[in-house]
C-alpha cells in the first residue's frame, strides 16, 4: 500500500497576519513574565529592602528630631529619643506661625512653592502631550529632524540659558521677578524630556486603533482627547511626578527668575537661608525640612499606582 505525501495547502494573507499576531502576543506575554520574574526575584527583594531601610532611617530621624526640644537637638542625637522621649510642637509653631526677622515663617514660602510647582508641572505636560502626539502620528515634513533637535536640547546645560532668558524676561517681556517668569522657565527646561518620553509611549500605541477612529470620522483633536490621553494616563502620571518633584526641589531656576523676593521666593530658598545662618536656627531645620517633603510624599503616594503602571508599560513595550 503506497503512502501519499501531504500536500502543502496555501496560506492566505489573513491567516498569516493572524499567525504573526499570535506569535507577537506570545512573545509579549513571555517578555512581561520575564520582567515580573526579575522584579520579584530574591536579589531584587533584598535590594529593595536595603534601599527602603537606607532611605527610611534618616527620614525617621528627621521626623523624630522635628518634635524634639531645641536643647535636646543641640546636645544629643535623635536616637536618644528611645531612652529620653520628649516631644514638643514649638518647632512647628515657630516655623509656620512665628513672625520676626529671625523666625523662619515658612507658610508664605510654602504657598509660593505650591504656586510655582503646580503650573510648572502642568504646563510642560500639557504642551508635551500635544507635541508628542503630533510628532508620533501627524506626518509632516521635517518631523524626524525636529524630534532629533528636541532630544538634543537635553544635552545643553540649563545654566547656559539662564542669562539669555533672564534678559528676555526683564528687558523684552518685563516679567522678571514674577510667577509667570518662573513658570515659563520651568516649562522651557522641562519640555524636551517630557516630549521625548511621551513620544516613545504614544508612538507605541497600535496604529489600528487610530485608523479605526479615523474611519469612524474622528479628527486629530477627537483622537487626541478620546484615545491618546486615556491610554497615556500611566505615562503622563509618571512624568508628572518627576516634573513636579524637580520643580518643587528646584532652587537655581526659581532663585534666578523670581529675583529672591519674598512674594515669589520658593521654600527651597528659605531653607538655604536657614542653613547659612551658622547654626542659629539649627533646632528649626528638622521641622522645616520635614515640611518641605510632605507635599512630594503626598504626590508620590497618591499617584503611585499610575507610576508603577507607567514604568511597567515602558519596560514591556517593543
Question: Would you name each region that the model predicts?
Answer:
Residues 1-49, 278-282, 304-318:
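Transmembrane alpha-helical segments of polytopic membrane transport and secretion proteins
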Residues 44-318:
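A structural signal for multi-pass alpha-helical bundles of membrane permease subunits
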Amino acid at each position: 500500500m503506497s503512502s501519499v505525501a501531504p500536500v502543502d495547502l496555501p496560506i492566505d494573507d489573513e491567516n498569516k497576519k493572524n499567525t504573526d499576531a499570535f506569535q507577537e502576543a506570545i512573545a509579549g506575554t513571555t517578555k512581561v513574565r520575564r520582567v515580573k520574574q526579575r522584579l520579584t526575584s530574591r536579589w531584587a527583594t533584598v535590594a529593595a529592602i536595603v534601599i527602603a531601610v537606607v532611605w527610611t532611617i534618616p527620614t525617621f530621624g528627621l521626623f523624630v528630631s522635628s518634635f524634639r526640644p531645641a536643647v535636646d537637638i543641640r546636645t544629643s542625637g535623635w536616637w536618644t529619643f528611645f531612652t529620653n522621649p520628649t516631644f514638643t510642637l514649638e518647632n512647628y509653631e515657630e516655623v509656620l506661625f512665628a513672625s520676626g526677622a529671625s523666625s523662619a515663617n515658612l507658610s508664605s514660602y510654602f504657598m509660593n512653592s505650591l504656586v510655582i510647582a503646580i503650573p510648572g508641572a502642568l504646563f510642560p505636560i500639557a504642551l508635551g502631550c500635544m507635541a508628542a502626539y503630533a510628532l508620533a502620528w501627524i506626518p509632516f515634513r521635517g518631523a524626524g529632524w525636529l524630534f532629533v533637535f528636541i532630544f538634543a536640547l537635553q544635552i545643553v546645560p540649563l545654566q547656559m540659558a539662564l542669562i539669555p532668558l533672564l534678559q528676555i524676561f526683564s528687558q523684552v517681556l518685563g516679567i522678571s521677578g514674577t510667577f509667570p517668569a518662573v513658570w515659563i522657565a520651568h516649562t522651557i527646561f522641562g519640555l524636551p524630556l517630557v516630549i521625548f518620553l511621551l513620544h516613545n509611549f504614544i508612538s507605541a500605541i497600535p496604529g489600528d486603533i487610530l485608523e479605526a477612529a479615523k474611519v469612524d470620522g474622528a479628527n486629530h483633536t477627537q483622537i487626541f482627547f478620546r484615545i491618546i490621553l486615556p491610554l497615556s494616563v500611566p505615562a503622563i502620571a509618571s512624568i508628572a511626578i518627576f516634573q513636579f518633584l524637580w520643580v518643587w526641589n528646584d532652587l537655581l531656576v526659581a532663585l534666578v527668575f523670581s529675583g529672591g523676593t519674598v512674594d515669589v521666593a520658593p521654600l527651597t530658598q528659605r531653607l538655604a537661608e536657614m542653613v547659612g545662618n551658622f547654626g542659629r536656627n539649627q533646632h528649626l531645620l528638622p521641622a522645616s525640612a520635614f515640611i518641605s517633603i510632605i507635599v512630594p510624599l503626598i504626590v508620590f503616594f497618591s499617584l503611585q499606582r499610575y507610576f508603577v503602571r507607567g514604568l511597567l508599560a515602558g519596560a514591556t513595550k517593543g
